[in-house]
Amino acid sequence: MSSRPKAFFINGGAGRVICAVPALEKYAEEHPDEKFLIVCEGGTDFFKGHPKLHNRVYDNWHKNLFHDKLVDMDLVTPEPYRVWEYFNQKCSLSQAFDIEINNKGVRDLGRPTLKLTQDEITNGKVGVKDVIAKTGKAKTIVFQPFGRGVQMKGDVVTDPSGRSFELGNVISIINKLQKEFSVIVMTELPLNFQTLGCKEQVATPSNLPIRQWAGIIKNVDMILTCDSVSQHIAYALNKPAVSVLGSTFPVNVSYPTCENIRVLDMGEGARIYSPIRITADEYADMNNDGIMAMNEKIENVIVDAVHELYNNCVKQ
């Protein structure tokens, strides 16, 4: 076995990065004397301020990183999607990272540490209060309806990955939620929700850094999300969440055993596992296409789940 320290290369979207944190925390605990590093190919946002990992983290464009550090290290690129336990629905994304990084099998992991600054928390609080002042509704919810694979073609919103809500359902659910909630929609798409059919004003903050979104999520009562980053932020911050899943399996991408996260599985019995980062599978993708489309009855199930979780986990 090599005595060289390791450099772990972490890539992918923000949700995937958050899911890597518990495994790296474990590695730090179990290798206290190793001067390992973490190289972030997708940004360092969710390592900033971390009490154990902050000083080990580098952007991959850091000046002279290779010649000053990496040339004397073993370079490791964990790929959780290629872990047997993951693609056979035996573990979560965080646990798959742990298997890749620590090789200890499937084990319980703690929540990832997400350290926000007082400025980020305060900005989130001020933003949420401003929304409440405009809507007159004290209950607050962040709604992230679209996953990373969403596309906008003209005025049509699609998601070939089968992770996102359908736009028509988004409008209907917002209208139902706005009867009691101030709704803050987390999306990068340039959508005018009033023009699309929302009866009341919808808060849609634009061009916010992802850590500022974390500050907002910390200050709302709860979130409603698809398979996307906000559910991982909510889990890290112990914030109640309703997670609606389609093409992806709850055990892989969400937290079905967490008491303040309610998982609603649109794809149960219908989805086929899509082996992303392993191979292309046209049949799986075609099968999962449109799997998140829902009728009004299902919309009502989602809205009822929001109210139930609010009453059980937020309202005191």
Regions found by a protein language model. Name each.
Residues L37, V57, K69-T77, I184, ...:
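Hydrophobic/aromatic beta-strand patches that form the interior of the parallel beta-sheet core
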Residues V156-V251:
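Donor-binding and catalytic core of enzymes assembling or modifying cell-surface/extracellular glycoconjugates
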Residues E34, G42-G43, K48-V157, T248-N252, ...:
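Conserved nucleotide-diphosphate donor binding/catalytic pocket of glycan-assembly enzymes
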Residues P5-A7, T140, M222:
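Structural motif
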Residues M1-P51:
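N-terminal pre-catalytic "stem/leader" segment of glycosyltransferase-like enzymes
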Residues N55-N60, T204-S206, I261-G267:
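Short acidic-hydrophobic, aromatic-tinged amphipathic segments that line or gate anion-handling sites
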Residues F9-V21, G149-F165:
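A short, glycine/small-residue-rich beta-strand->loop->alpha-helix junction that serves as a flexible
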Residues V83-D130, T257-Q316:
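Leloir-type glycosyltransferase catalytic cores
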